[in-house]
């Protein structure tokens, strides 16, 4: 008998009214209790044995005018990074094809800009169209966006736009001075208004306090609509940046941040993002237990190191994790299909001695997907 997780049709109400005191209380929970609660939430909305996989490519590297203290791409710091012009569309398409071949379902493109210039937009839009034509989900991070730029990206086929809040409003001024917190929130509003999915998270380990981490998650969870994707980054210290000698964050604190994010944002994909190169397999496994269900494939994230794809494949094999496939139907339809599947399996289980419902092979969902494809 194969034992698998037993999902439930019960859902958790999405809250946009979290207080910092509530979130600090979550951070203060005993570690095992916190992870247990995060797992309960996670299993009500996701298959815990599936992870969404993206690939991230730097399409324009270095010479950024911003002063983000963690970033090796800032022109203000001597990090030895060679600046590069906007990548040719043909090279971007080739990298997207390679990403699809190794199992990525989303291709993310990042440019070290304060904001895209009008002269660059035609090339950017063409990149989106070409990558989208490969059957991949598309994501970009280009800095701040105007409403018109967001609409143009949406019309070109962009699915996700990444713009992180980075840290709490209280600590933000210690990390960045060249753009305001409000600037970031305005860009997220422009992305939402254009009808794109929001990808927004932050970085931990920059010298912030637990209260700062709680405050950052409050900002994300209390947005008018919670981000569809929430990357949680561990600071990668780069020589030459102002944060290259900051004290290391305790790994358990990072895992706690993943777990609290999962509890607060039940339907969001929580991405185990930058910093994985320094994590052993056991720590990454605990992050997945805490509710992380998205990673980047590939040996580099923009300019910093990332585990080799082969290493990730082997880790997934050890943990029994499969890569999540792109859904061809809406979230609402999928929820209905899932509930029907659960009810069907519960009826079947009443006449058997199985202790677990096997929901790893959703027959009803598969039928609907085949019908959609037909």
From Swiss-Prot:
Which keywords describe this protein according to UniProt?
Answer: 2Fe-2S, 4Fe-4S, Biotin biosynthesis, Iron, Iron-sulfur, Metal-binding, S-adenosyl-L-methionine, Transferase
Q: Identify the residues that the record assigns to the Radical SAM core domain, covering every copy.
A: 49-276
> Where would one find coiled-coil regions in this protein?
none
Enzyme Commission identifier(s): 2.8.1.6
Protein's pathway:
Cofactor biosynthesis; biotin biosynthesis; biotin from 7,8-diaminononanoate: step 2/2
Q: Where is this region: Disordered?
A: 344-374
Q: Does the keyword 4Fe-4S apply?
A: yes
Question: What Gene Ontology biological process does one annotation of this record name?
Answer: biotin biosynthetic process
Source organism superkingdom:
Bacteria
Question: What PROSITE patterns does its record include?
Answer: RADICAL_SAM
Q: Which CDD domains match?
A: Radical_SAM
Q: How is the cofactor bound?
A: Binds 1 [4Fe-4S] cluster. The cluster is coordinated with 3 cysteines and an exchangeable S-adenosyl-L-methionine. Binds 1 [2Fe-2S] cluster. The cluster is coordinated with 3 cysteines and 1 arginine.
Give the reaction(s) catalysed.
(4R,5S)-dethiobiotin + (sulfur carrier)-SH + 2 reduced [2Fe-2S]-[ferredoxin] + 2 S-adenosyl-L-methionine = (sulfur carrier)-H + biotin + 2 5'-deoxyadenosine + 2 L-methionine + 2 oxidized [2Fe-2S]-[ferredoxin]
**Which Gene Ontology molecular-function terms are recorded?**
2 iron, 2 sulfur cluster binding; 4 iron, 4 sulfur cluster binding; biotin synthase activity; iron ion binding
Q: Which Gene3D superfamilies match?
A: Aldolase class I
Binding-site list for [4Fe-4S] cluster: 64, 68, 71
Essential cofactor(s): [4Fe-4S] cluster; [2Fe-2S] cluster
Question: Known InterPro entries for this protein?
Answer: Aldolase_TIM (IPR013785), BATS_dom (IPR010722), Biotin_synth/BioAB (IPR002684), Biotin_synthase (IPR024177), Elp3/MiaA/NifB-like_rSAM (IPR006638), rSAM (IPR007197)
Q: Where does [2Fe-2S] cluster bind?
A: 108, 139, 199, 271
Question: Could you describe the subunit structure of this protein?
Answer: Homodimer.
Q: What family does this chain come from, according to its entry?
A: Belongs to the radical SAM superfamily. Biotin synthase family.
Q: What does this protein do?
A: Catalyzes the conversion of dethiobiotin (DTB) to biotin by the insertion of a sulfur atom into dethiobiotin via a radical-based mechanism.
Protein name, entry field:
Biotin synthase
Annotated source species? Alteromonas mediterranea (strain DSM 17117 / CIP 110805 / LMG 28347 / Deep ecotype)
Gene that produces this protein? bioB
């Amino acid at each position: 008998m194969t034992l698998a997780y037993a999902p439930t049709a019960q859902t958790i109400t999405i809250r946009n009214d979290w207080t910092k005191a509530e979130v600090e209380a979550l951070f203060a929970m005993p570690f095992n209790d916190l992870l247990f609660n995060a797992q309960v939430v996670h299993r009500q909305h996701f298959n815990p044995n599936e992870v969404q996989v993206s690939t991230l490519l730097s399409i324009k590297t270095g010479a950024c005018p911003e002063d983000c203290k963690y970033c090796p791409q800032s022109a203000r710091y001597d990090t030895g990074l060679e600046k590069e012009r906007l990548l040719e569309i043909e090279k971007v398409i080739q990298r997207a094809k390679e990403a699809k071949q190794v199992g990525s379902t989303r291709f993310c493109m990042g440019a070290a800009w304060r904001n895209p210039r009008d002269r660059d937009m035609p090339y950017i839009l063409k990149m989106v169209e070409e990558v989208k034509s490969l059957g991949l989900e598309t994501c970009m991070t280009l800095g701040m966006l105007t409403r018109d730029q967001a609409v143009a990206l949406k019309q070109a086929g962009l699915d996700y736009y990444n713009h992180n809040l980075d840290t709490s409003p209280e600590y933000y001024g210690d990390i960045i001075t060249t753009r305001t917190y409000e600037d970031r929130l305005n860009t997220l509003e422009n992305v939402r208004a254009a009808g794109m999915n929001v990808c927004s998270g932050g970085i931990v380990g920059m010298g912030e306090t637990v209260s700062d981490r709680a405050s950052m998650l409050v900002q994300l969870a209390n947005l008018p609509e919670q981000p569809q994707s929430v990357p949680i980054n561990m600071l990668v210290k780069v020589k030459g940046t102002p944060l290259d000698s900051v004290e290391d964050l305790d790994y358990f604190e990072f895992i706690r941040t993943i777990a609290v994010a999962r509890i607060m944002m039940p339907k969001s994909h929580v991405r185990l993002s930058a910093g994985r190169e320094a994590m052993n397999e056991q720590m990454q496994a605990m992050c997945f237990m805490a509710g992380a269900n998205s990673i980047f494939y590939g040996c580099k994230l923009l300019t910093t190191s990332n585990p080799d794809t082969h290493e990730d494949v082997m880790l997934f094999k050890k943990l029994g994790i499969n890569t999540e496939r792109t859904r061809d139907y809406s979230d609402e339809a999928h929820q209905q299909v899932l509930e029907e599947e659960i009810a069907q399996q519960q009826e079947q289980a009443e006449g058997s001695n199985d202790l677990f419902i096997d929901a790893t092979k959703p027959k009803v969902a598969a039928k609907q997907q085949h019908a959609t494809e037909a």
